[in-house]
Each structure stands twice: as structure tokens, then as C-alpha cells.
């Protein structure tokens, strides 16, 4: 019996000071309260960032829609401005009463902002225009190529040199003379002398009874 008691006492030896300290620290640690990390501030920041980003996306989209609408309006305005109005169409043609032009006289009318010469030619002028040698012309054209009715010569009153307006019934050939640089045109409006390279231009026109419609 004594031997057994001795063995038991041997098994339960007193704890050392170091062991007691470790156990005490473990108990204190187990009793201490660990704080759970608070993510509210982070979540709030993320939510604020998401809201800001969503607002930015909304503004970009809205500006895109406004830009598209503005571009569409601009295109529609541009196209509508290109559509010819009644006034513009009226200016595209000009009607002249030929009965009001005396024989051997010129009139000047305005067509699309350009002067148009209309000459009521005499029989002598018609004969003179047809008697010209083509080899003597800088820009060869017969009179028949330049008129629809021999007694009516209709052409643009713009010098083919630099765009000045020639003077009627003047020059060395009894037709038109450009005072800017000295070009002379005959009674058919053909260049005969001076720096102009071409004859006076013939516009599109048609006769309608006693009237002519230019354009």
C-alpha cells in the first residue's frame, strides 16, 4: 500500500512557476475579446464610388444622346438649306419679252447673278457674222453654232479672260470690247483680238413665242 501511494504522489508533481505562467497567459488570452473587423466604412466608400461611377456613366450616356440629337438636327438643317426654295428656282430661269427689244439694239438681263447679253441683230450683222473666215478665229465657231435664231444672239456678258463685263457696240469688230485688258469680240461674240482665250459663252435658253427663257 505504501508503494502505491508513493507512485501516485510521484505522478502529481507540483507545477513549476513557468508552467503556471503559461497556463495563466492562455486563460487570459481565451478570456480576451477579439474584435470583428468593421467593413462599414469600406462598404460605404465602395457604395459611394459605385454611385459616382454610375452617375458618370449616366452623364456620358445623356451627353451622347444630346450630341446625337444635335448632330441629327444639324444634318436636317443643312439638308433643308440645300433644298431649293421657290425663289431660288425662280432665279434659275429668266424670261425676256423679245418684242420689247428694237432691231439693232442690245439689252442686258441678270440671270443667276450674271449679266446676259441679248442682241437683236440686223440682216447686215447676220451676213457679217457668217462671212468670217474660220481660220482667222482664235476659238473657231460658225455663227450657226452660236445661235438658234439668226436675228437673236444670246450670250453671257462675261469676258473669258478675267471675268470683266464687255461694252456693247464697241471694239474693232463692231461687237463687244472688254475695257479691262482690251479683248475684242465680233457681232457673233467670238474673240477676235486681245488676251481672252475663248468666245463669249452661250447659256441654255429656249424660245416661247415672242419670249425667250434663259436657263
Curated annotation (Swiss-Prot):
Q: Which PROSITE patterns match?
A: RIESKE
Membrane-traversing stretches? 51-80
**Record-level GO cellular component terms:** mitochondrial inner membrane; mitochondrion; respiratory chain complex III
Annotated keywords: 2Fe-2S, Disulfide bond, Electron transport, Iron, Iron-sulfur, Membrane, Metal-binding, Mitochondrion, Mitochondrion inner membrane, Respiratory chain, Transit peptide, Translocase, Transmembrane, Transmembrane helix, Transport
According to the UniProt record, which cysteines are disulfide-bonded?
164-180
Ranges per topology, Mitochondrial matrix:
31-50
Q: Which residues lie on this side of the membrane: Mitochondrial intermembrane?
A: 81-215
Q: How is the cofactor bound?
A: Binds 1 [2Fe-2S] cluster per subunit.
Additional remark text: The Rieske protein is a high potential 2Fe-2S protein.
Describe, as the record does, how this protein assembles with itself and its partners: Component of the ubiquinol-cytochrome c oxidoreductase (cytochrome b-c1 complex, complex III, CIII), a multisubunit enzyme composed of 10 subunits. The complex is composed of 3 respiratory subunits cytochrome b (COB), cytochrome c1 (CYT1) and Rieske protein (RIP1), 2 core protein subunits COR1 and QCR2, and 5 low-molecular weight protein subunits QCR6, QCR7, QCR8, QCR9 and QCR10.
Q: What is this protein called?
A: Cytochrome b-c1 complex subunit Rieske, mitochondrial
Protein's organism: Saccharomyces cerevisiae (strain ATCC 204508 / S288c)
Q: Which gene encodes it?
A: RIP1
Amino acid at each position: 500500500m505504501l508503494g502505491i501511494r508513493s507512485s501516485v504522489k510521484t505522478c502529481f508533481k507540483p507545477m513549476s512557476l513557468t508552467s503556471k505562467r503559461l497556463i495563466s497567459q492562455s486563460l487570459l488570452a481565451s478570456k480576451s475579446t477579439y474584435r470583428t473587423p468593421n467593413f462599414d466604412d469600406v462598404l460605404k466608400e465602395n457604395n459611394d464610388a459605385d454611385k459616382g461611377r454610375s452617375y458618370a456613366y449616366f452623364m456620358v450616356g445623356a451627353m451622347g444622346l444630346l450630341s446625337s440629337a444635335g448632330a441629327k438636327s444639324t444634318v436636317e438643317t443643312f439638308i433643308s438649306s440645300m433644298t431649293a426654295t421657290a425663289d431660288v428656282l425662280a432665279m434659275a430661269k429668266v424670261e425676256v419679252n423679245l418684242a420689247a427689244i428694237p432691231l439693232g439694239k442690245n439689252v442686258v438681263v441678270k440671270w443667276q447673278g450674271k449679266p446676259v447679253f441679248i442682241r437683236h441683230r440686223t440682216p447686215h450683222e447676220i451676213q457679217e457674222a457668217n462671212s468670217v473666215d474660220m481660220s482667222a478665229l482664235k476659238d473657231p465657231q460658225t455663227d450657226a453654232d452660236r445661235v438658234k435664231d439668226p436675228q437673236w444672239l444670246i450670250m453671257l456678258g462675261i469676258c473669258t479672260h478675267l471675268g470683266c463685263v464687255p461694252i456693247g457696240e464697241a471694239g474693232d469688230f463692231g461687237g463687244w470690247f472688254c475695257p479691262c485688258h482690251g479683248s475684242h469680240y465680233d457681232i457673233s461674240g467670238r474673240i477676235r483680238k486681245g488676251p481672252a482665250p475663248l468666245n463669249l459663252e452661250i447659256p441654255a435658253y429656249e424660245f416661247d413665242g415672242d419670249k425667250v427663257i434663259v436657263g
